[in-house]
UniProtKB/Swiss-Prot annotation:
It is a multi-pass membrane protein. Its EC number is 7.1.1.2. This is NADH-ubiquinone oxidoreductase chain 4. Pfam families: Proton_antipo_M. It comes from the Eukaryota. It comes from Prototheca wickerhamii. The chain crosses the membrane at residues 22-42, 62-82, 120-140, 149-169, 170-190, 204-224, 246-266, 276-296, 303-323, 338-358, 366-386, 404-424, 444-464, 488-508. Coiled coil: none annotated. The gene is ND4.
Length: 523
């Protein structure tokens, strides 16, 4: 055989190997691999082929979303264990084996890039894969510089976020938990909308990074005591009450900044205001959930005594955040800041439910996080629709826009009503369960949190009145077009999700129920 024939044979063998390797992947491995492969493919596309770049990014993210739906279809809701895993021991079945393995581990060679999905991480994965193609669509026309780098940043960010929700090793969780900051820092700093975008990017990066230093030290302490960082093995470990409190505070320092809780929330409004619309969508829809997901995945099951001990601290900080940010929201004139401060209030309502020490509160918190991941991005998309037309986010310029943009007005009112938990929308069942769970644990806290709901309705109705029904400025808005087809396609899946959860939340609650019970009573 000549050289060309040999080269062709090797080429065919490599293609067959890659083909077979791809199709023997588990669903979760495919979900992680596709956006990363899309980002790698974009490296070889010339920068001037912007339409090709956008198509590759959109198709990669859409394919990832479709495969993530297969996770839900194949998911066994009767099991509390991690699913779609390869070679990961189940703590309920192999408890003696895993404990022996943990005791015998003596080096970081025991680190294992194991992936798995349970009823808690399932919906965060689906939510992530849903929002990324929406981000690509919203940036279709308004990102004109460094388009290739922009799409690569979002696809890499998607891979990192999905890995955070699916990795089963504590140190690897920390690595990807912090790695998410890098592409988001670039997105805010390069494609932000105003002169202060560099300051906002550094503020976002440094606030969230410094809070995680103590968490890294806590992870090392956990490893030296248990000899393992495998999440399933750690659920079987036992820490003294004093050590639980120390470790809990170290994890709290990292997760509280990500939520964010008062007083470490200052970075969020600035980051939202300066970020491009797609950056705000990801920031509100996914990145704010990383902190509460960390509480749920680690703080509650690993440190049960410390959770009970520090519950008054969580309740106090959460109630202050809800009331303070709700009052602050009423005084804002920037549309993005209004939505950003309302996000702080909603996420602190989530923390109240997480530490209610009962399944109603925890399930309600997860449902509320999913709802917030649909409603808040939708509101930021609405602001983006207005910003694309006149490059300002100040409320006073858009008074009476409902007269010239009736479809937009209908969408904005719908999403605003969902934001204040109108029955029939996605926020209502989540907030109702959180209220029931917190009332069972502390009725006074539930009452204080309910005042935040009233304040939320006040600023939401005030916003609708000013924006939709105010006195119009004909010279400013008469030439605007209403929501176009591309923009409606962005809103459609969010509308469907909000109505589905609001009318029929049972499939979501069924999938997460066993996992919530297991985490709550893991020890």
């Amino acid at each position: 055989m000549n050289r060309n024939e040999i080269s062709f044979i090797y080429y065919v063998k490599i293609k067959l190997y890659l083909y077979n390797s791809f199709f023997i992947m588990s669903y979760i491995e495919m979900v992680l691999a596709i956006p990363l492969l899309g980002a790698i493919a974009l490296l070889f596309v010339p920068s001037w082929k912007t339409q090709t770049i956008r198509n590759i990014a959109l198709n990669s993210s859409l394919l990832t979303f479709l495969i993530s739906l297969l996770l839900w279809i194949e998911f066994d809701s009767s099991s509390a264990l991690f699913q779609f895993t390869d070679g990961v021991c189940s703590p309920n079945v192999y408890s003696d084996v895993t404990l022996a393995k943990a005791a015998s581990s003596s080096s970081f060679s025991a680190l294992n890039f194991a992936l798995g999905v349970d009823g808690i991480s399932l919906f965060f994965i689906i939510l992530t894969t849903l929002l990324v193609p929406i981000c690509i669509l919203v940036s279709w026309n308004n990102i004109e510089v460094y388009v290739k780098e922009y799409c690569i940043a979002f696809l890499v960010l998607e891979t990192l976020m999905l890995t955070v929700f699916s990795v089963l090793d504590l140190l690897l969780f920390y690595i990807f938990f912090e790695s998410v900051l890098i592409p988001m820092f670039i997105i805010i700093g390069v494609w932000g909308s105003r002169e202060r975008k560099i300051r906002a990017a550094y503020q976002f990066f440094l606030y969230t990074l410094f809070g995680s230093v103590l968490m890294l030290l806590a992870i090392l302490l956990i490893y030296f005591q248990t000899g393992t960082l495998d999440i399933e093995m750690l659920y079987l470990s036992d820490f003294s009450e004093t050590r639980q409190c120390i470790l809990w505070l170290a994890f709290f320092a990292s997760f509280a900044v990500k939520v964010p809780m008062v007083p470490v929330h200052i970075w969020l409004p600035e980051a939202h205001v300066e970020a491009p619309t797609a950056g705000s969508v990801i920031l509100a829809g996914i990145l704010l959930k990383l902190g509460t997901y960390g509480f749920l995945r680690f703080s509650i099951p690993l440190f049960p005594y410390a959770c009970i001990y520090f519950t008054p601290l969580i309740y106090t900080m959460s109630v202050i955040a809800i009331v303070y940010t709700s009052c602050t929201t009423i005084r804002q004139i920037d549309l993005k800041k209004i939505i950003a401060y309302s996000s702080v209030a909603h996420m602190n309502f989530v923390t109240i439910g997480l530490f209610s020490q009962n399944t109603q509160g925890i399930e309600g918190s997860i449902l509320l996080m999913i709802s917030h991941g649909l409603v808040s991005p939708a509101l930021f998309l609405c602001v983006g629709v207005l910003y694309d037309r006149h490059k300002t986010r100040l409320l006073r310029y858009y008074s009476g826009c409902g007269q010239t943009m009736p479809i937009f007005a209908l969408l904005f009112v719908f999403f605003t009503m969902a934001n204040i938990s109108l029955p029939g929308t996605s926020s209502f069942p989540g907030e109702f369960l959180v209220f029931i769970g917190s009332y069972q644990n502390n009725s006074f806290v539930a009452f204080c949190a309910a005042t935040g709901m009233v304040l939320g309705a006040a600023y939401a109705l005030w916003l609708c009145n000013r924006l939709i029904y105010g006195v119009s400025k004909p010279d400013f808005i008469n030439t605007w077009s209403d929501v176009n087809r591309r923009e409606f396609f962005m809103f459609a899946p969010l509308i469907a999700g909000i109505l589905w959860i609001g009318v029929y939340p049972e499939p979501f609650l069924d999938a997460m129920h066993c996992s919530c019970i297991y985490l709550l009573y893991a020890q």
